[in-house]
Amino acid sequence: MTIRFSDAHVDTWRKEGAVVVPEFFNDKEIKDVTKDFKKIFPGRKAEDKALNKKKKGDFGNKLPLQLSGEPMGKTTMDQFKNFENIPFDCSSSLNLIAVHPSLIEFARSVLKTNDVRLYQAQAWAKFTGEADFDQAFHCDFGNHTLTVPSQDECLNSITFIIYFTDVTEEHGPTHYVNRTDSNGFEGMKRFLKNREDVDHQKELRRFERSAAGPAGTLLAYGIDVFHRGTNLTEPGGYRYAMTSCFKKAGNDSIGYTSWPWHFTKPWQNIFEHATPDQLSCFGVPMPGDPFWTEETLSLTQLRYPKWNMSEYR
């Protein structure tokens, strides 16, 4: 397997909490995933004019579950209109991209473990005019843990946002602030003390960086990193992206998706094409695990008749 990230990328992530890796995915992967996006989000149409629901002085729409306890507004709901959990009724190209071997290796490297779990993975399609996608700066720990980020980054998690379309500043790239910059003005403490602090938002915007890039670009960041979505303003513009979040196995302080809860989804599209390594990211025991007995092998085969279980026998 060709490694698609470098030690420098890992070092930057450890220091700054975020790093952009261009051309992480190749043209064929981009083409195949894009085809699946069009299948699972059919008939979506972008407008010629961007939607702006902000009032003068606003710093983006509030996000749900960012520790505010306030109800989600209509605009915020619209931002997540095309935000869906895997698996989908499409090819393995999209269904397995969140557990691509290079993403798994990246997660293992930064979390310093060989045993990682995928705890969130969604396809996200945005279209100009469908919503006002501008967000205020926030951190993901608000809805990924009930406490706060650990001081040991290996006890936190890593989130990947992958673009499968070219993303310019007019296509709603994620903006983020390096950890060393936000720490310089006690960003986390100020956020927790007053989540509506306009001056804090202004300060964060002074240091914001853009993750804009061509299709195949990867943004990796931690749950303690301030970031925000930006609005799509390109006439007829759209953005196809995938989120993929990993944590160390056994880290129960972090969570988001309970995969068995989505049992009605077409899991055969994953089981019939994934490797044992990829399936383990969903919590499926590896070959040789004591879980696998003649009985469990037989029953699991009944559940997924077309799954090739030869490596587990």
Describe the predicted segments one by one.
Residues 43, 51, 190-191, 218-220, ...:
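Non-heme Fe(II)/2-oxoglutarate
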Residues 113, 118-120, 155-161, 171, ...:
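Extracellular structured ligand-interaction cores
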Residues 120-125, 139-141, 158, 162-166, ...:
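Short, structured patches in soluble enzyme cores that scaffold and shape functional sites
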Residues 100, 108-117, 150-154, 164-171, ...:
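Secondary-structure boundary elements
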Residues 130-137, 146-149, 170-179, 185-189, ...:
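A short secondary-structure junction signal
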Residues 1-15, 22-145:
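Non-heme Fe(II)-dependent double-stranded beta-helix
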Residues 154-157, 167-227:
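Double-stranded beta-helix
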